Amino acid sequence: MHDIQIIIMAGGVGSRFWPMSTPDYPKQFIDVMGVGRSLIQLTVDRLKPICSVENMWVVTNEKYIRIVKEQIPDMPVDNILAEPEARNTAPCIAYACRKIQKKHPDANIVVTPSDALVINTSEYQRVLSKALSYTSDKNAIVTIGIKPSRPETGYGYIAAAELTSVDEIYKVEAFKEKPNLETAEQYIAS
């Protein structure tokens, strides 16, 4: 696979984890799992088999730049990006992609949050590698989802269409934003 670049989104304030997470020191920088590593450090650790830290980019709030430098000291300073303004996910991704495109016009880009809970790291790496292999020679975007085990109203759902030429990779019919409980139950039943 060629020129893999990874964007790690780390700008949120983690208000749902208060009082552990505060606006000055949000959850992505805290050892919430009790393993001696913060969530962002665990994210970098599980991505290292995919690409080197030199090819990872963190997009964060200006006031968290120092924390990122402390927690990921081997990341190039130029790869730690301060969002000009907190505008949520899409502008964060666009900003980082623009920076990457200037240095790596043919990059195969992964976007991930800094605070995802990943239990089965080897399966995550396998799926991510498969997605990168698929996108390496196509003009395609792959989104990775997990099959829900129960109806959940706090997350969006991916409605899968037909299988592509690659096993486990489906075309997306639609993204269904956070549904009410009745709709979530219908998604689980289908």
State the predicted function of each range.
Residues 29, 80, 141-143:
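Conserved beta-strand scaffold positions in the cores of enzyme catalytic domains, especially
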Residues 7-10, 150-152:
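Short glycine- and Lys/Arg-enriched binding-loop motifs that mark or flank ligand-binding interfaces
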Residues 121-190:
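Conserved core of the sugar-phosphate nucleotidyltransferase
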Residues 24-30:
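Short alpha-helical oligomerization interface
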Residues 31, 82, 174-177:
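Structural signal for conserved beta-strand scaffold positions within catalytic alpha/beta enzyme cores
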